[in-house]
Each structure stands twice: as C-alpha cells, then as structure tokens.
C-alpha cells in the first residue's frame, strides 16, 4: 500500500507543476491585455504592446533579409453594420525605419472602385475628417478589402484628436470613427521616419 502511494506522488507533482505553468501563462496574458496590449494574428510577429492612447505596436523580422518590421494599429471606436464583430482599423507598416504603407481596413468588403488614380490605378473616393478639417481623397483600392492611405492624411492623423473616414460600402455610406490621440510620436518617428503635420484648411 505504501509503495502504491509513493508511486503516485511524483505523478501528482508533475500535474501540479503543469497546472502552475498554465495559471502563470494565463496571468501573463491577462496582464498584457490590462496594459493595453493585443495578440498578434500573424505568425512570426510579436504580440502588440501599447504605444499610447488606443495604439498598439507589433514587431517582427523578415526571415530572409533580416529587415526589422514594425506595424502600428489603431482600431476604430465603432463598427460597420455588415460586421459587428470586426471593427475598422488603420495600420502603418514600416520596414528598417521607413514607412512602407498606411492602409485603412474597413472590416467589410469594399464596393468597386469609383475613380482612377493619377497612373490609372483603381481608387475609392472617401471623405476624411482630421480634427476641424475635412477633405475628399482618392485612396488606392486593394483587393476589395483595403484602401491605401495617402501620406498627408497619415501625417495629419497621427497628431490628431479626431479622425473619421466616410466611405461607400455595400450596405450604404458608413463612417469609421477613430480616437488617435495619445500616440507615442517618438516611437513612430524612430520606426517609420514619420512626423505629424496638420492638414491645411484651404
């Protein structure tokens, strides 16, 4: 009988060890969310950390070139009627200290392009509000899921308090509302060589 009890003790210790590890992992994840972080949906990309306000920063490295990649993400305050489970978002993609792409992801399928760009590329016209200014822009239409933002809008947004995008969708016109205030501008400058610039009221 005693021998049987002794054989069970190591097994119980192993179970307790793995249970403790599981609990610690859960606590670590909760702390990440409590600090404003976010889990990355991409393989090879580190989970996001807060960089002020509602912004998160994600870091990764190109496996072939070793290039340092940084992605900044700002999720909208609201969602579109078509998909209440996925909010629109803005993402800045930077590689080796330079901005490569700023895109607007509405979280729903986009309608067909409604205008050509300077080089004939398909675009969708949107109305943008940055604080107390508003203007119409043609953003490059990418695979009916993304719009590539112009650099002027991007620079205006990162230093703004209010940022809104109105666009046509398959369910009618919708407005994505963002709260960009609080972003660590130093982090963006280091990762993307990007600084804020207020848009002209003209």
Residue spans for each PLM region:
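A generic "folded-domain core" signal
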Residues: 33-202
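N-terminal secretory signal peptides that target proteins for export/translocation
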Residues: 1-16
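Bacterial N-terminal signal peptides
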Residues: 18-29
């Amino acid at each position: 009988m005693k021998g049987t009890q002794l054989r069970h003790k190591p097994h119980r210790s192993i179970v307790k060890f793995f249970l403790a590890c599981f609990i610690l992992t859960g606590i670590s994840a909760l702390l990440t969310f409590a600090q404003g972080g976010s889990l990355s949906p991409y393989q090879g990309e580190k989970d996001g950390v807060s960089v002020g306000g509602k912004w998160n920063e994600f870091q990764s490295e190109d496996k072939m070139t070793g290039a340092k990649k940084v992605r900044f993400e700002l999720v909208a305050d609201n969602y579109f009627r078509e998909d209440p489970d996925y909010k629109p978002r803005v993402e800045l993609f930077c590689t080796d200290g330079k901005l490569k792409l700023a895109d607007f992801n509405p979280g729903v399928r986009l309608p067909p392009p409604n205008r050509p760009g300077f080089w004939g590329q398909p675009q969708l016209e949107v109305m943008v509000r940055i604080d107390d200014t508003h203007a119409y822009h043609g953003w490059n239409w990418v695979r009916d899921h993304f719009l590539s933002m112009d650099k002027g809008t991007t620079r205006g947004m990162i230093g703004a308090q209010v940022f809104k995008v109105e666009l046509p969708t398959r369910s009618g016109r919708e407005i994505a509302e963002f709260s960009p205030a609080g972003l660590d501008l130093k982090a963006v400058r280091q990762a993307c060589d990007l600084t804020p610039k207020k848009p002209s009221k003209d």
